[in-house]
């Protein structure tokens, strides 16, 4: 079986388990249990691997909790960020799950213990609340303790049965891949709400490559609307670890999604000291403002959401929004996210942000913000994508690429609306499509019906309209008509009609002649 076949089989198993164990509970409402169990297994195996340190004579899961000294525990927490006693490991709990009448209470105690092990250590903020959504007392699991334990046991046994290989034999990516697959499927089945926390991997790949283009190294990468962390992790997947020197940063407003993002970091083997995901409203309660600016920013913020805007008189003086001289409309926060990202961008940095297309041509405050961006030469490229690439919306969105190190004053426009492959319910970008977009992005050369670099003066003369269709002429797919050939065909047709009329007249005359003779 090839690696692709193995992965496909693993995905089939995971989704079958996710559907089997949830019973009559909606998959979206049950996701935290399956995802949480997978995470629990991962950190257990990860921790065991660390404690065994390659010594085959040590089997950490078989050790007695009592042999763990305070020094051993302290050293492990400083390195891994948390501590798990042998009895608390996933494999030991799952092995007895079916016969444990206190399973829900035991799981809750274990999760509390894992989180509390980080108290007072640098990892505390990264570990705190990780299992908050794995509510072992929820009625979603059943109405009685027995029902709850039965459902929890089914989840643990299902995840236990997944063939994720030997943790030490380079199978670590299987955990992260399995987690991303689950999140992707939950998002696809959740419709609009799913699109709010997960960016499809094929689009994430393009965004990450745009933000990281030409960089031999970046200090760190940031997503102000992190969701489940999928965009940040694409940067890790497609670039060597040493390129991103100080790690992965993000902020997320939804508590459940915030926990998913932190779990996602761990599951992709990013240690606690290499990521910092914060909870809160990016626009009104921003974190990381005191950090060094970011060399790479990626984001797929919510489209045209409402925000407090001008109702908060202090925001116009906020260093993120003040330079533009105007706030994004209260009913459409899109440009608030753009200005936030720009403020956090370093002098050598580049940001790639998914945007609702209306912000590129509407008037009012949005036009003034576009003027600020263009006049200060921050807009490198605007890319229009094909429709139906994202979960929960069929809208053809755009990607805005901002840069603080442009070498000319032109703005590049790329029409990628025809670059897609149709799949079951959504369109996708193939690797060939992404490569084609990146080639024209890098070269900045004009290609008919695909890309055009426009002078600053042209954009100004067009009232700072940044809509791709205003600059890249769409391909005319109408049939080209040869007028001379058409006239010749008409002449021939008319001649044939005239001859037919003569023939008909002759036949009619012959018939009438016959009737007269009678």
Where are these regions (language model features)?
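A conserved structural/catalytic subdomain of Rossmann-like adenosyl-cofactor enzymes
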Residues: 5, 285, 291-518
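Generic marker of residues within folded, mature protein domains
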Residues: 168, 240-241, 267, 390, ...
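A structure-centric signal for secondary-structure junctions around beta-strands
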Residues: 34, 175, 218, 245, ...
């Amino acid at each position: 079986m090839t690696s692709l076949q193995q992965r496909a089989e693993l995905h089939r198993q995971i989704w079958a388990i996710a559907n089997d164990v949830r019973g009559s509970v909606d998959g979206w409402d049950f996701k935290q249990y399956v995802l949480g169990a997978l995470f629990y297994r991962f950190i257990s195996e990860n921790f065991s691997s660390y404690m065994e340190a390659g010594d085959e004579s040590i089997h950490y899961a078989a050790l007695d909790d009592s042999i763990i000294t305070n020094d051993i525990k302290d050293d492990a927490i400083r390195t891994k960020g948390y501590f798990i006693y042998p009895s608390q490991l996933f494999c030991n709990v799952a092995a007895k799950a079916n016969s444990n009448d206190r399973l829900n209470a035991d799981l809750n105690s274990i999760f509390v213990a894992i989180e509390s092990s980080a108290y007072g250590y640098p990892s505390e903020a990264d570990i705190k609340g990780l299992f908050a959504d794995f509510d072992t007392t929820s009625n979603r699991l059943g109405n009685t303790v027995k029902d709850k334990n039965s459902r929890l046991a089914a989840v643990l046994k299902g995840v236990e049965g997944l063939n994720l290989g030997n943790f030490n034999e380079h199978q670590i990516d299987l955990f992260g891949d399995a987690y991303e697959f689950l999140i992707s499927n939950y998002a696809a089945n959740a419709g609009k709400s799913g699109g709010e926390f997960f960016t499809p991997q094929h689009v994430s790949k393009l965004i990450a490559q745009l933000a990281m283009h030409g960089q031999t190294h970046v200090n760190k990468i940031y997503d102000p609307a992190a969701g489940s962390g999928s965009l940040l992790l694409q940067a890790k997947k497609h670039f060597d670890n040493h390129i991103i020197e100080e790690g992965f940063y993000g902020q997320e407003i939804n508590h459940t999604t915030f926990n998913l993002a932190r779990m996602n970091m761990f599951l992709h083997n990013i240690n606690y000291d290499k990521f910092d995901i914060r909870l809160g409203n990016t626009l009104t309660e921003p974190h990381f403002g005191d950090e060094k600016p970011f060399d790479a920013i990626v984001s797929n913020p919510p489209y045209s959401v409402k925000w407090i805007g001008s109702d908060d008189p202090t925001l116009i003086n906020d260093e993120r929004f003040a330079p533009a001289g105007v706030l994004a409309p209260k009913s459409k926060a899109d440009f608030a996210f753009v200005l936030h990202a720009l403020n956090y961008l370093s002098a050598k940095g580049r940001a790639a942000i998914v945007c609702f297309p209306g912000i590129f041509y509407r008037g009012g405050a949005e036009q003034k913000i576009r003027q600020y961006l263009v006049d200060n030469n921050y807009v490198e490229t605007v890319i229009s994508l094909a429709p139906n690439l994202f979960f929960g919306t069929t809208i053809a969105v755009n990607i805005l690429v901002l840069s603080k190190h442009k070498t000319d004053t032109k703005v590049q426009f790329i029409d990628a609306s025809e670059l897609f492959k149709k799949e079951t319910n959504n369109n996708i970008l193939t690797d060939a499509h992404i490569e084609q977009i990146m080639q024209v992005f890098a070269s900045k050369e004009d290609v008919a019906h695909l890309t055009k670099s426009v002078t600053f003066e042209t954009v100004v003369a067009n009232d700072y309209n940044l809509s791709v269709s205003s600059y890249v002429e769409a391909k005319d797919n109408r049939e080209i008509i040869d007028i001379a050939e058409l006239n010749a065909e008409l002449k021939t047709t008319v001649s044939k009609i005239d001859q037919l009329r003569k023939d008909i007249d002759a036949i009619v005359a012959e018939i009438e002649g016959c009737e007269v003779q009678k």
